[in-house]
């Protein structure tokens, strides 16, 4: 009768609940948990007992790739946030969101997922975020994070160059999509539940799997392959399921 039930903060307001059956969970316990949470008017997704479940696993590149782009000197915090929010439709840019969550909390989640996946480079934490957390730049709660909340006029303005912005959006989005596809590939959850989790759990503008259907699987494969060829790092390796879907010309939601 053991089962995991994961709420999102703040629990009274956030609609999503992830239900995680353990190895020893029986069908009656699972069905009872699903019915209970639905009676509370929550949106339920069921997922495998793996690190990060659905949301905290699939969302890692939203923070990690944004930090990597900053560390490479491609764009500053404000420009990356502008690209993801204004061009991508995300409710908050990654640096605004990390400041809202708290750099200490967000870093700890990334580090725990990284360790739980046996140091898979896809989830590698950022030294930038580690140093900010160590310096006490925790975000809104400390008055200073990637942005200065006590002296907001000191923050840089975004460089609203659409070519640069499109590059940033494409790079972060293809990494998110690759992670969502990996969750399907590894049977973490169904395509429907994974998209539901990302739209209801972290307010993404679209489900990532519906998004790749819309953009084209070949387009996303090409973006990932370019990054993989350029950097030679496993974090950019396209998922085998994506390659198979391109070869077979299939979609997650054909209708």
What are these regions (language model features)?
Residues 38-49, 53, 67, 71-255:
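NAD(P)-dependent Rossmann-like dehydrogenase/reductase catalytic/cofactor-binding core
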Residues 1-57, 91-92, 103:
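Rossmann-fold dinucleotide-binding core
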Residues 15-18, 64-65, 178-179:
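Positions in alpha-helical segments
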Residues 12, 61-62, 172-176:
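Alpha-helix N-cap/N′ positions at the starts of helices
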């Amino acid at each position: 009768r053991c089962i995991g039930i994961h709420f999102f903060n703040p629990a009274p307001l956030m609609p999503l609940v992830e239900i995680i059956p353990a190895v020893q969970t029986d069908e009656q316990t699972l069905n009872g948990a699903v019915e209970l949470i639905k009676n509370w008017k929550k949106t339920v997704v069921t997922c495998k007992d793996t690190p990060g479940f659905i949301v905290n696993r699939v969302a890692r590149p939203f923070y990690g790739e944004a930090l990597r782009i900053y560390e490479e000197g491609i764009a500053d915090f404000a420009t990356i946030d502008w690209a993801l929010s204004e061009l991508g439709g995300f409710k908050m840019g990654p640096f605004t969101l990390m400041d809202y969550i708290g750099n200490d909390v967000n870093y700890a989640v990334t580090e725990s997922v990284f360790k739980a996946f046996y140091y898979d480079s896809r989830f590698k934490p950022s030294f930038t975020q580690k140093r900010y957390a160590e310096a006490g730049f925790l975000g809104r709660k400390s008055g200073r994070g990637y942005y200065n909340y006590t002296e907001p006029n000191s923050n840089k303005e975004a460089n609203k160059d659409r070519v640069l912005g499109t590059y940033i959006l494409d790079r972060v989005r293809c990494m998110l999509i690759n992670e969502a596809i990996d969750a399907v590939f590894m049977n973490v959850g169904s395509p429907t539940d994974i998209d539901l989790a990302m739209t209801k759990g972290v307010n993404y503008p679209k489900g990532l799997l519906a998004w790749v259907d819309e953009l084209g699987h070949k387009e996303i494969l090409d973006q990932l392959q370019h990054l993989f060829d350029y950097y030679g790092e496993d974090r950019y390796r396209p998922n085998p399921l994506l390659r198979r879907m391109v070869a077979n010309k299939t979609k997650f939601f054909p209708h």
